[in-house]
């Protein structure tokens, strides 16, 4: 149970019933204490008798230790106690089936007192938990029932519970004082909040939901401290000063900036503005990038006073603020750029020179890319003349051409009309764009060079393997059967590019595939003899279950294929 017991919600009948139950509890406790006290007296008396019998040990062997009657074989047999180890008769002993023995009356009473009193347990509870449930209930109901003439708590309850009444009273008063204080604090806080809400309710109509929380915080602080609020004219002056200070290189403190922005938004909300009027008036102002645009808009808003009329005008002005401000910001920079673009300055000249230099650099990079592409195409043609067939090169060449086409298109493509129609763009923006273009072209050139190196590595790998490549001018179908090899020799030797082909070239073209096929198809023993053919009528052919080291396809090649040199006329 907690430190404080609140029974104030109970009715009078319920409180009376609980009081009676608690009183019965105390009566039962008193009776139990009296019973245990009588048992303790009996134990003391019998313990004195045992002290007398302890001197005469021989008497215990013939007489009972409690009633001092002689033992009888059938009527009063001798039994030994488990605790005191003295002999007693059957009438003065109690059976103990759990321990399979007997206990004399004094030892049995001692166990009952020990189990009933539980002095060790109550002592532990008193030391650890100094307040019990019944005592707390009595304490809480005592004052309530005493006023109505109820009974008072009996003095018997003060065994260990009534010792802490004063401490409980102090704790109760402290516990009652804490919720009262907390309630007072909460009420004071809520009162201030309600005051702030009531003061700001008239001003909340002018604040949109997306405004920064700085002015609201200042309003709440002002309402709490009771200081008067500053006038709108002073706020406008502060805003104009901060806008003048907020040049492209200068940035005010974040708190001041938020205050100025919030004040400017309040002014713009109360003023009905039109896009045409804002654009025309913006022609007479010097527009600067960054915070300068905001300062010019604030000046415009300060020139035209607010029309505090009906609520409909305020709503329409609040709804159209975002669109009007956007159109004004779009119109003013463009017109200022047209005004300043007709007068060339030193910055414009530097800008033109930088543009020319960057264009020359990009053209130089594009020329390098074209030359590297031409070198790659020449190497491809040389590789195609050296080898018979390759499937990767026809797919790689279009990729190179496509990449080169992309680079040339990107380099030769003129600027769009939007870029030409914007003479007032800053040098930094154009420099960044040109740097991006240079980086793109450099990456494309690097990609082309990597593709060329990949083609070179493939050609070197094919040369190391001993394969030859034929030109891919006219793709010809090739038969998989080696019996048509003489026809292919004649066709491959006489290409449209090389009509007067010599027979030595034809032999060179076909020697490498023949050697490879012979190398991979012949058994290891027949590799020493170049002119030996496979004997189909050999004595040893092997069993059906034994695997031939050469595949069946290889056997067919041996049986039908012959050296190219022997087939020539």
UniProtKB/Swiss-Prot annotation:
Keywords: Coiled coil, Metal-binding, Repeat, Zinc, Zinc-finger
InterPro entries: FYVE_2 (IPR041282), Intracell_Transport_Effector (IPR051745), Melanophilin_FYVE-rel_dom (IPR037442), Myrip/Melanophilin (IPR006788), Rab_BD (IPR010911), Znf_FYVE_PHD (IPR011011), Znf_RING/FYVE/PHD (IPR013083)
Domain RabBD: 4-124
Biased composition (Basic and acidic residues): 352-362, 379-390, 526-535
A single GO molecular function term of this UniProt record: myosin binding
Region (Disordered): 143-430, 490-569
Residue ranges the record marks as coiled coil: 431-465
Subcellular location field: Melanosome
Zinc finger (FYVE-type): 58-112
One GO CC annotation: cortical actin cytoskeleton
Name of the molecule in the record: Melanophilin
Gene that encodes it: MLPH
């Amino acid at each position: 149970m907690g430190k404080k017991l609140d029974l104030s919600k109970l009715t009078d009948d319920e409180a009376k019933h609980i009081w009676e139950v608690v009183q019965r509890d105390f009566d039962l406790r008193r009776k139990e204490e009296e019973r245990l006290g009588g048992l303790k007296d009996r134990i003391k008396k019998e313990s004195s008798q045992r002290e007398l019998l302890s001197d005469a040990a021989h008497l215990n062997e013939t007489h009972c230790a409690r009633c001092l009657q002689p033992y009888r074989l059938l009527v009063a047999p001798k039994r030994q106690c488990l605790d005191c180890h003295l002999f007693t008769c059957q009438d003065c002993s109690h059976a103990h089936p759990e321990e399979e023995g007997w206990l004399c009356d004094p030892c049995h009473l001692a166990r009952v007192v020990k189990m009933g009193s539980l002095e060790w347990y109550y002592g532990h509870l008193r030391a650890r938990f100094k307040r019990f449930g019944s005592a707390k209930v009595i304490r809480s109901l005592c004052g309530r029932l005493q006023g109505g003439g109820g009974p008072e708590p009996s003095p018997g309850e003060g065994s260990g519970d009534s010792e802490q009444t004063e401490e409980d009273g102090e704790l109760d008063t402290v516990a009652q004082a804490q919720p009262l204080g907390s309630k007072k604090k909460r009420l004071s806080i809520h009162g201030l909040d309600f005051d702030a809400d009531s003061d700001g309710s008239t001003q909340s109509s002018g604040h949109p939901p997306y405004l920064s929380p700085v002015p609201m915080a200042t309003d709440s602080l002002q309402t709490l401290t009771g200081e008067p609020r500053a006038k709108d004219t002073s706020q406008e002056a502060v805003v104009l000063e901060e806008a003048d200070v907020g040049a492209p290189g200068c940035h005010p403190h974040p708190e001041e900036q938020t205050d100025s922005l919030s004040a400017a938004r309040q002014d713009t909300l109360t003023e009905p503005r039109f896009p045409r009027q804002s654009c025309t008036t913006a022609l007479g102002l010097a527009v600067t990038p960054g915070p300068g645009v905001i300062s010019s808009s604030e000046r415009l808003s300060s020139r035209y006073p607010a029309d505090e009329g009906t609520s409909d005008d305020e709503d329409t002005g609040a709804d159209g603020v975002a669109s009007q401000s956007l159109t004004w910001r779009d119109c003013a920079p463009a017109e200022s750029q047209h005004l300043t673009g007709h007068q060339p300055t030193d910055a414009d000249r530097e800008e033109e020179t930088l543009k020319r230099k960057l264009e020359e650099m990009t053209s130089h990079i594009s020329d390098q890319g074209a030359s590297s592409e031409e070198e790659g195409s020449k190497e491809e043609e040389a590789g195609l003349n050296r080898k018979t067939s390759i499937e990767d090169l026809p797919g790689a060449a279009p990729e190179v051409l496509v990449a080169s086409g992309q680079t040339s298109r990107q380099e030769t493509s003129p600027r769009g009309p939007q870029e030409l129609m914007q003479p007032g763009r800053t040098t930094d923006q154009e420099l960044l764009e040109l740097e991006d273009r240079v980086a793109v072209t450099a990456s494309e050139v690097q990609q082309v060079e990597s593709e060329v190196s990949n083609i070179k590595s493939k050609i070197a790998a094919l040369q190391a393997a001993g394969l030859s490549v034929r030109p891919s001018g006219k793709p010809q179908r090739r038969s998989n059967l080696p019996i048509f090899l003489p026809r292919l020799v004649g066709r491959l030797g006489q290409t449209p590019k090389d009509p007067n082909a010599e027979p030595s070239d034809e032999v060179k073209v076909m020697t490498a595939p023949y050697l490879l096929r012979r190398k991979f198809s012949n058994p290891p023993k027949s590799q020493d003899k170049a002119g030996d053919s496979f004997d189909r009528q050999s004595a040893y052919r092997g069993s059906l279950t034994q695997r031939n080291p050469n595949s069946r396809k290889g056997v067919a090649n041996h049986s039908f294929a012959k050296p190219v040199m022997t087939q020539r006329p």
